[in-house]
């Protein structure tokens, strides 16, 4: 009877202290990933140091699924520079190129952007009544990229069941691996 139970429930044969150790190991993996992310945030100066290009608006510079590394260094922005910005009321950041910079008398400046593959500037994407972006909208400058690496993120976003399935499989794998 015990043999049948151990085949049905593979965790029944594992000592409780080993299960606890596996749970701690899983927690350490999650904590390490969070620390790496926080470290990237501090090192890059950006709230989102890595983003995935979600549309084709920046073709030929970037394609859907490219993974961008961002940096938010001090210094003036330049026309032609690729930036990532967030619009109030929209949760997904946008990757586009600076089209115009309007310097104001107080030393601050306004920025207008456009996707390389778009026919018009981004004023239509901004909040109603907004004509320019300020520095506060910019979350980073594109400093490097890895082609197509972000497609995994896009597939998981498009098929959320796959994301939960993969997390479940990884959790079972980590918890059931014996050391």
From Swiss-Prot:
Pfam family, one: Peptidase_S24
Gene Ontology biological process terms, A to Z: signal peptide processing
Main location: endoplasmic reticulum
Catalytic activity annotation: Cleavage of hydrophobic, N-terminal signal or leader sequences from secreted and periplasmic proteins
UniProt-recorded name of the protein: Signal peptidase complex catalytic subunit sec11
Active-site residues per Swiss-Prot or TrEMBL entry: 57 (charge relay system), 96 (charge relay system), 122 (charge relay system)
Protein task: Catalytic component of the signal peptidase complex (SPC) which catalyzes the cleavage of N-terminal signal sequences from nascent proteins as they are translocated into the lumen of the endoplasmic reticulum. Specifically cleaves N-terminal signal peptides that contain a hydrophobic alpha-helix (h-region) shorter than 18-20 amino acids.
UniProtKB keywords: Endoplasmic reticulum, Hydrolase, Membrane, Protease, Signal-anchor, Transmembrane, Transmembrane helix
Domain text: The C-terminal short (CTS) helix is essential for catalytic activity. It may be accommodated as a transmembrane helix in the thinned membrane environment of the complex, similarly to the signal peptide in the complex substrates.
Cytoplasmic side: 1-22
Enzyme Commission numbers on file: 3.4.21.89
Organism: Dictyostelium discoideum (Social amoeba)
GO CC, any one term: signal peptidase complex
Membrane-topology descriptor: Single-pass type II membrane protein
Transmembrane parts of this sequence: 23-43
């Amino acid at each position: 009877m015990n043999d049948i139970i151990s085949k049905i429930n593979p965790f029944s044969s594992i000592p409780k202290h080993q299960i606890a150790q596996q749970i701690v190991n899983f927690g350490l993996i999650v904590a390490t990933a969070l620390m790496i992310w926080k470290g990237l945030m501090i090192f890059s100066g950006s709230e989102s140091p890595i983003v995935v290009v979600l549309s084709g608006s920046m073709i030929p510079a970037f394609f859907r699924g490219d993974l961008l590394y961002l940096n938010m260094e001090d210094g003036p922005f330049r026309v032609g520079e690729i930036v990532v910005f967030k619009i109030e009321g929209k949760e997904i950041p946008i990757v586009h190129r600076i089209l115009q910079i309007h310097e104001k008398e107080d030393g601050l400046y306004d920025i207008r952007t456009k996707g390389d593959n778009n026919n018009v500037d981004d004023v239509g994407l901004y909040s109603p009544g907004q004509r320019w972006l300020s520095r506060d909208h910019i979350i980073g400058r594109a400093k490097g990229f890895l082609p197509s690496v972000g497609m995994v993120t896009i597939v998981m976003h498009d098929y959320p069941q796959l994301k939960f399935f993969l997390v479940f499989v990884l959790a079972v794998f980590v918890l059931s691996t014996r050391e």
